[in-house]
């Protein structure tokens, strides 16, 4: 599962929090709870307009915390700072593509196992 979130005042936006709330029946803090099949992997991606990575790290930590309650292993994260316009993302294309390749390669290794 890949979760991507922009920074809204140093946190995930309300829509993302609503998504997390909707997943409560599958969280290990809710008894009895449904469960996802074991072995799921997650990837946390955060972006913000400001230059500091600390805010992205907070968002990625929130996503990783969510994964933990779903018993999903966080297998990677990517923080993108100073992203206000499309051009800023285009300038990071190689980094984003490398991250996506890493996800795909990890998936292929899992399929082979």
Task: Describe each PLM feature range.
Residues 1-65:
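Helix-loop-strand module that forms the ligand-binding subsite of alpha/beta enzymes
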Residues 57, 61-113:
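Glycine-rich phosphate/pyrophosphate-binding loop and the adjoining helix
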